From Swiss-Prot:
Mode of membrane association: Single-pass type II membrane protein
Top-level taxonomy: Eukaryota, Viridiplantae, Streptophyta, Embryophyta, Tracheophyta
Family: Belongs to the glycosyltransferase 8 family.
UniProt entry tagged with the keyword Transmembrane helix: yes
Gene that this sequence comes from: GAUT1
Protein name, as recorded: Polygalacturonate 4-alpha-galacturonosyltransferase
Tissue expression summary: Expressed in seedlings, inflorescences, flowers, siliques, pollen, roots, stems and leaves.
């Protein structure tokens, strides 16, 4: 029994030992193999995701690399690129390509380890498991890229981006000269809107611009002079004789120091002492004499006096400018006198011009020039001939007064215009031009007109009427343009020229211009709000308001093509006489020839191209140089005639280049550029 009991105990122990062994096996399995499976699976997933990111980055770098290589190829020649490729291949493991081929991060590299040693480990026994794993990773990465990245939309967007980058790179590399010039011009236009004065003032490279104005001391001294005058008047009223004398002494010192200085640099060294001394005297005067009402009254009186002085000076300036425009310079007067004397010393047979048979030939090109200025007339003729293609076909009809008839003849006898024909006439020998036929001559004989012209104390002697008191408005040479068919009865067309113009191109094409039945061919001068009829005519008069449009465009005298056949048909001279008689009291327009010309040729003027006639060189300083150089005729209309000292220096060379200043007559009369 005991033996059985012992055997049964042993069996129980064995049974319990077998159960604990199975539990131990399960415990070891879960503790070892489960984590092992987890880490192995996670490692596979990480490797696949790394491969995916590496492939995508590699693709992104590939297209950037291709774009960069295209730009590089456009910049360097093939030989240079071959040298670069050879040098790059020779770098071996130091090359960027070898770095990119290694999938590991740079932080995993061992320093001091030979790369060739790592790559040479077990070259003949490749790891089968690693190869299988790499194949699986490649297949996984390719599938995931095709599913997640290589969609048609993304491919299309990437292609568009590549095209835009290529186009931009080509534009930057292949800019030609025209494109660069356009960009420069655009930059210049944008810079015009920038106030360069402000930029210069605040430039860190020009610190002197940050200082006070260059005339600050002068303005301070002028202010002190004004206040010294004010306090001098008050001191005189209050019998402060000592202070008055001191103020007057300092006032004289300040005025002496100021002189004609326009900037602080013009002031003497003692200016600062004078400023300080005057400031002390003014402070003393303010303590003793300051009275708000008295000071204000004195300043107002001084302001009113200054305004009156300004108006007087403006009127005087206008008068002097008009007077200067009327005068003939001494050298030109000398030239006229010398030529006149020499002309009347000639025998009658030597006073005739050649080729007189051309004067009435309608197949030639005829010019009408009415002038009493020998030098100006010579410039018109010379400039026309020098720019004519065939001078032998040009005929010049000059008309002057009896005072300049000899001088005009003598000049062109000594200086004939080449093969061209020229003829000089005296307006005083036109017997048909008398007061019974010509309204202007009849009006000039009236007492009212003589009073208007020759009495300076007349109520209308203001600056607004000074320009109409020019002697040219009294001369029949100025009104002879309205009698062209009577002066040249056998001509069909004639080109009228003023004596203050120069010709820069051949004018013969003007005879081929179709005037479309009009009488006058002229260049229009009107802008948006100026040089229209309301500027020249009195539209408060019912005769003017009824017959003309105030916004009608004005045109210019100076170069006009007249069709004399149409002139005779339409009785242009009769129309001129009618309106001139109506304007006897100057109620329709002021004196001059342009207003009656606008009226007479109203609706009968054919507009010419503006390039034929450029005006304003006698008053406008801002005419475009290109317009002047491209013009066929340049007109110095205005007071600043090119033969006067008033002339604008930048326009004068266009006129003087047609004068031979080495001519003996010009040298004797001291005529020079």
């Amino acid at each position: 029994m005991a033996l059985k009991r012992g055997l049964s105990g042993v069996n129980r122990i064995r049974g319990s030992g077998g159960g604990s062994r199975s539990v131990l096996v399960l415990l070891i399995f879960f503790c070892v193999f489960a984590p092992l499976c987890f880490f192995v699976g996670r490692g596979v997933y990480i490797d696949s995701s790394n491969d995916y990111s590496i492939v995508s980055v590699k693709q992104n770098l590939d297209w950037r690399e291709r774009l960069a290589m295209q730009s590089v190829r456009s910049l360097f020649s093939k030989e240079i690129l071959d040298v670069i490729a050879t040098s790059t291949a020779d770098l071996g493991p130091l090359s960027l390509d070898s770095f990119k081929k290694n999938n590991l991060s740079a932080s995993w590299r061992g320093t001091g380890v030979d790369p060739s040693f790592r790559h040479s480990e077990n070259p003949a026994t490749p790891d089968v498991k690693s190869n299988n794993l790499n194949e699986k990773r490649d297949s996984i990465s390719k599938d995931s890229i095709h599913q997640k990245v290589e969609t048609p939309t993304k491919i299309h967007r990437r292609q568009l981006r590549e095209k835009r980058r290529e186009m931009r790179a080509n534009e930057l590399v292949q800019h030609n000269d025209d494109t660069i010039l356009k960009l420069e011009n655009a930059a210049i236009e944008r810079s015009k809107s920038v106030d360069s004065a402000v930029l210069g003032k605040y430039s860190i490279w020009r610190r002197e611009n940050e200082n006070d104005n260059s005339d600050s001391n002068i303005r301070l001294m002028r202010d002190q002079v004004i206040m010294a005058r004010v306090y001098s008047g008050i001191a005189k009223l209050k019998n402060k004789n000592d202070l008055l004398q001191e103020l007057q002494a300092r006032l004289k010192d300040s005025q002496r120091v100021l002189g004609e200085a326009t900037s602080d640099a013009d002031l003497p060294r003692s200016a600062h002492e004078k400023l300080r001394a005057m400031g002390q005297v003014l402070a003393k005067a303010k303590m003793q004499l300051y009275d708000c009402k008295l000071v204000t009254g004195k300043l107002r009186a001084m302001l009113q006096t200054a305004d009156e002085q300004v108006r007087s000076l403006k009127k005087q300036s206008t008068f002097l400018a008009q007077l200067a425009a009327k005068t003939i310079p001494n050298p030109i007067h000398c030239l006229s006198m010398r030529l006149t004397i020499d002309y009347y010393l000639l025998s009658p047979e030597k006073r005739k011009f050649p080729r007189s048979e051309n004067l009435e030939n309608p197949n030639l090109y005829h010019y009408a020039l009415f002038s009493d200025n020998v030098l100006a007339a010579s410039v018109v003729v010379n400039s026309t001939i020098m720019n004519a293609k065939d001078p032998s076909k040009h005929v010049f009809h000059l008309v002057t007064d009896k005072l300049n008839f000899g001088a005009m003849n003598m000049w062109f006898l000594l200086n004939p215009p080449g093969k061209a024909t020229i003829h000089v006439e005296n307006v005083d020998e036109f017997k048909w031009l008398n007061s019974s036929y010509c309204p202007v001559l009849r009006q000039l004989e009236s007492a009212a007109m003589r009073e208007y012209y020759f009495k300076a104390d007349h109520p209308t002697s203001g600056s607004s009427n000074l320009k109409y008191r020019n002697p040219k408005y009294l001369s029949m040479l100025n009104h002879l343009r309205f009698y062209l068919p009577e002066v040249y009865p056998k001509l069909n067309k004639i080109l009228f020229l003023d004596d203050d113009i120069i010709v820069q191109k051949d004018l013969t094409p003007l005879w081929e211009v179709n005037l479309n039945g009009k009488v006058n061919g002229a260049v229009e001068t009107c802008g948006e709000s100026f040089h229209r009829f309301d500027k020249y005519l009195n539209f408060s008069n019912p005769h003017i308001a009824r017959n003309f449009n105030p916004n009608a465009c004005g045109w210019a005298y100076g170069m006009n093509m007249f069709d004399l056949k149409e002139w005779k048909k339409r009785d242009i001279t009769g129309i001129y006489h009618k309106w001139q008689n109506m304007n006897e009291n100057r109620t329709l327009w002021k004196l001059g020839t342009l207003p009656p010309g606008l009226i007479t040729f109203y609706g009968l003027t054919h507009p010419l191209n503006k390039a034929w006639h450029v005006l304003g060189l006698g008053y406008n300083p801002s005419i475009d140089k290109k317009d002047i150089e491209n013009a066929a005729v340049v007109h110095y209309n205005g007071n600043m005639k090119p033969w006067l000292e008033l002339a604008m220096s930048k326009y004068r060379p266009y006129w003087t280049k047609y004068i031979k200043f080495d001519h003996p007559y010009l040298r004797r009369c001291n005529l020079h550029e």
